[in-house]
């Protein structure tokens, strides 16, 4: 590493960006069961199991409410065709609540398969690290004390932006994991709504929202792949420009590229909702 403070500061901020983006790449292919050693998943499954009793109680309640609202009298309920429909609805709702965790994991595995397929088709197995161009490092190191003063300000601002963007993008990916955990933990309660016709929309909305959260991973991966190809050609460095102008031009274009990626990742949930009509 260079002994120049300006170069060191820029290299450290780029190292933070590279580390966070590598972590994003790893998290997108990781299952919630393996996240942080599986300790969080164990707590979530325990909560899911504890709420199962409440979900089954609500299942009966929603079923009764649905019967009362749908049929005008008990005589209609006793008709074979109506009784069969009610039995099938209750059985399906009971199965959805009881095996809700397995169904949700199956849906997540489908999306994880999509992520693996996208990664394989793109031919990109990891993210290429961003490094400072050698000609820019040489130009900065050749500057005198007074020539370096403008670059200090540019470097401080640029490094701050890059570091903040690094944490924003990793927080967005962590937020997706936490949303999956929350959906999984309380799943028995909204899934019980399938038992009644008036309340079944709650269950449908829950499934759609959960599917959208899962699909966010594929959208984030696509954004990272596009950025990887886009950033394969680093910002051009004007060798004839003054060192301060050279650093400003390079850092400015680099931050713009990063903003595009971070903005796309932050909008992943909105993109999925627009795709699914939510």
Region spans (language model):
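Alpha-helical transmembrane segments
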Residues: 191-208, 240, 271-275
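Short amphipathic alpha-helical coupling elements at transmembrane boundaries
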Residues: 23-26, 82-89, 109, 116, ...
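Alpha-helical transmembrane segments and their helix-start/interface "positive-inside/aromatic belt" motifs
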Residues: 1-10, 80-100, 203-213, 268
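Hydrophobic, aromatic-rich alpha-helical transmembrane segments
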Residues: 43-50, 79-86, 148, 152, ...
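Binding/recognition "hotspot" determinant
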Residues: 1-58
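Non-cytosolic segments of integral membrane proteins
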Residues: 94-186, 224-277
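Alpha-helical transmembrane spans of integral membrane proteins, capturing the lipid-embedded, hydrophobic core
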Residues: 58, 62, 66, 86, ...
């Amino acid at each position: 590493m260079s002994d120049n403070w300006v170069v060191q500061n820029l290299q450290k901020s780029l190292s933070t960006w590279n580390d966070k983006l590598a972590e994003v790449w790893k998290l997108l292919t990781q299952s919630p069961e393996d996240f942080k050693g599986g300790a969080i998943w164990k707590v979530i499954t325990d909560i899911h199991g504890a709420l199962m009793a409440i979900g089954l109680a609500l299942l009966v309640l929603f079923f009764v409410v649905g019967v009362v609202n749908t049929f005008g009298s008990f005589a209609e309920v006793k008709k074979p065709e109506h009784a069969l429909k009610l039995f099938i609805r209750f059985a399906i709702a009971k199965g959805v609540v009881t095996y809700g965790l397995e169904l949700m994991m199956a849906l997540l595995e489908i999306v994880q398969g999509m992520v693996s397929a996208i990664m394989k088709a793109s031919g990109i197995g990891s993210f290429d690290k961003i490094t400072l161009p050698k000609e820019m490092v040489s130009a900065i190191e050749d500057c005198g004390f007074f020539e370096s003063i403008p670059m200090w300000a540019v470097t401080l601002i640029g490094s701050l932006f890059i570091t903040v963007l690094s944490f924003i993008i990793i927080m967005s990916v962590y937020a997706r994991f936490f949303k999956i955990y929350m959906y999984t933990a309380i799943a028995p309660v909204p899934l019980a709504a399938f038992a009644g016709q008036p309340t079944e929309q709650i269950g449908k909305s829950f499934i759609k929202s959960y599917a959208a959260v899962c699909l966010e991973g594929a959208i984030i991966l696509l954004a990272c792949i596009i950025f990887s190809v886009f950033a394969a050609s680093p910002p051009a460095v004007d060798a004839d420009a003054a060192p301060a102008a050279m650093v400003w031009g390079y850092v400015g274009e680099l931050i713009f590229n990063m903003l595009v990626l971070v903005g796309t990742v932050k909008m992943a949930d909105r993109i999925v909702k627009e795709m699914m009509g939510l």
